[in-house]
Amino acid sequence: MRQTADLYCVLGNPIAHSRSPAIHARFAELTGERIRYERRLLPIDGFARGLRDFAAQGGRGCSVTVPFKTEALRCATACSERAQLAGAANTLSLHADGSISADNTDGLGLVADITRNAGIALAGCDVLLVGAGGAAAGVLGPLLHAGVRHITVANRTLAKAQALVQSHSALAALRKTQLKACGLQAPLADFDIIINASASSLAGADVPVPASVLRPASLAYDMMYGPAAQGFLDWARRHGARPRDGLGMLVEQAAEAFWLWRGLRPPSAQVLAELQEAAAKPASGADR
């Protein structure tokens, strides 16, 4: 039995809002693992140095949140296909020989939350992915692997949506999924699942797509959680859709990171249920 707890952290700026320490502490408690998991606020230009300092202190792994996910991938000596395709990493594993492995568990977390926690099969679904930034890039690959029938990436800047689609075109062809890009002003069909990966929730802006994209009982999923997602969820509810925020995605992506680090699958559904039970309390809501 280990006498000292292994050290992990979440790196970001801002970082005070992060629920990751509480989630990983609960995972450790339920699995009997001895870990210490901290928040670490880094200067905007200080990610590489902060990562080196953490490694020098014996750190075993770290979660990475905004704005450092792209830089985290560059700092790694090896990366998963998921991270490479996304162009960003949210999970780093630090090894005894000084090497660093990068992965991106965001999309796995999203797929797990939709399929296991919400009970919705993704195979054969038509999906609208709103946004073409880092959040969208992190989930597009796993959505393709999940066997969806069609994905439309809609973004205010059409060129960004087109670039994201182009970077995933080979995988889409392999998975026999129709994948296309459009601007937010383009006519849109209706969809089984609408995923908001845009910054509209954080900005408090109106939902960037019309209600006509919704089918009866469509899943309307905001990757944010708590107050940040409320406007989108209210919009979905008003139009007869099934609203869901990204709290389950947060827990499930953390569970994937825990498995990468510890080789154990934590009881993520139990931890999510505990967080949902406390959902009536005020919650900040954005990222890892």
UniProtKB/Swiss-Prot annotation:
EC number in record: 1.1.1.25
Residues annotated to bind NADP(+): 81, 131-135, 155-160, 223, 246
GO BP term (any one): shikimate metabolic process
Key words, A-Z: Amino-acid biosynthesis, Aromatic amino acid biosynthesis, NADP, Oxidoreductase
Record-listed shikimate binding positions: 18-20, 65, 90, 106, 225
Gene Ontology terms: cellular component: cytosol
Coiled coil (UniProt feature): none
Catalytic residues as annotated in Swiss-Prot or TrEMBL: 69 (proton acceptor)
A matching Pfam family: SDH_C
Top-level taxon of the source organism: Bacteria
CDD domains, per database record: NAD_bind_Shikimate_DH
Molecular function GO terms recorded: NADP binding; shikimate 3-dehydrogenase (NADP+) activity
Pathway membership, UniProt: Metabolic intermediate biosynthesis; chorismate biosynthesis; chorismate from D-erythrose 4-phosphate and phosphoenolpyruvate: step 4/7
Reactions mediated catalytically: shikimate + NADP(+) = 3-dehydroshikimate + NADPH + H(+)
Job of this protein: Involved in the biosynthesis of the chorismate, which leads to the biosynthesis of aromatic amino acids. Catalyzes the reversible NADPH linked reduction of 3-dehydroshikimate (DHSA) to yield shikimate (SA).
Family per record: Belongs to the shikimate dehydrogenase family.
Subunit structure: Homodimer.
Protein name: Shikimate dehydrogenase (NADP(+))
